[in-house]
Amino acid sequence: MIALIQRVRRAEVRVADRVTGAIEAGLLALVCAERGDTEAAADRLLAKVLGYRVFSDAAGKMNLSVQNLDGAGRAGGLLLVSQFTLAADTNSGLRPSFTPAAPPDEGKRLFDYFVAAARAKHPVVETGEFGADMQVSLVNDGPVTFWLQTHA
């Protein structure tokens, strides 16, 4: 599975002009399931997303995770948005191939699993809508962006 995480001051996702998820300071994670991914890969990716140290401590060093945003135990927001295009094969030609992405039914199942697992482990989880045409807006903080990937 893949997650492109961005440290944000705020972010929101809309579907048909309706806000489906919004957070203040935290992480926006664009999430993609690849062919052959499993719940175990989703669990490993979620552990990375929740534990990845991308927020600055008092000394200015990236040493804090979204679970401990301020060093005093305050959790930041986590906005999860499905994005199958992260799995695109761009190695040949000028049109991406999405063959590496999980089929839609499997992608939805794994994204739903990922969201449920995140909600069980983190207090502030918002989402987009799988397969919908979404408008995502955010205010990057830094910017700080990381590509995280786990394999089945």
Curated annotation (Swiss-Prot):
Top-level taxon in the UniProt lineage: Bacteria
Quaternary structure note: Homodimer.
The keyword Hydrolase appears for this protein: yes
This protein's domain notes: A Gly-cisPro motif from one monomer fits into the active site of the other monomer to allow specific chiral rejection of L-amino acids.
E.C. no: 3.1.1.96
GO molecular function, one term: Ser(Gly)-tRNA(Ala) hydrolase activity
Catalytic activity: glycyl-tRNA(Ala) + H2O = tRNA(Ala) + glycine + H(+); a D-aminoacyl-tRNA + H2O = a tRNA + a D-alpha-amino acid + H(+)
Any GO CC annotation of this UniProt entry: cytoplasm
Keywords: Cytoplasm, Hydrolase, RNA-binding, tRNA-binding
Subcellular location: Cytoplasm
Membership in a protein family: Belongs to the DTD family.
PANTHER family listed in its UniProt record: D-AMINOACYL-TRNA DEACYLASE 1 (PTHR10472:SF5), D-TYROSYL-TRNA TYR DEACYLASE (PTHR10472)
Root EC class: hydrolase
Keyword Hydrolase attached: yes
SUPFAM superfamilies: DTD-like (SSF69500)
Any one GO biological process: D-amino acid catabolic process
Protein name: D-aminoacyl-tRNA deacylase
Short motif (Gly-cisPro motif, important for rejection of L-amino acids): ranges: 142-143
Function: An aminoacyl-tRNA editing enzyme that deacylates mischarged D-aminoacyl-tRNAs. Also deacylates mischarged glycyl-tRNA(Ala), protecting cells against glycine mischarging by AlaRS. Acts via tRNA-based rather than protein-based catalysis; rejects L-amino acids rather than detecting D-amino acids in the active site. By recycling D-aminoacyl-tRNA to D-amino acids and free tRNA molecules, this enzyme counteracts the toxicity associated with the formation of D-aminoacyl-tRNA entities in vivo and helps enforce protein L-homochirality.
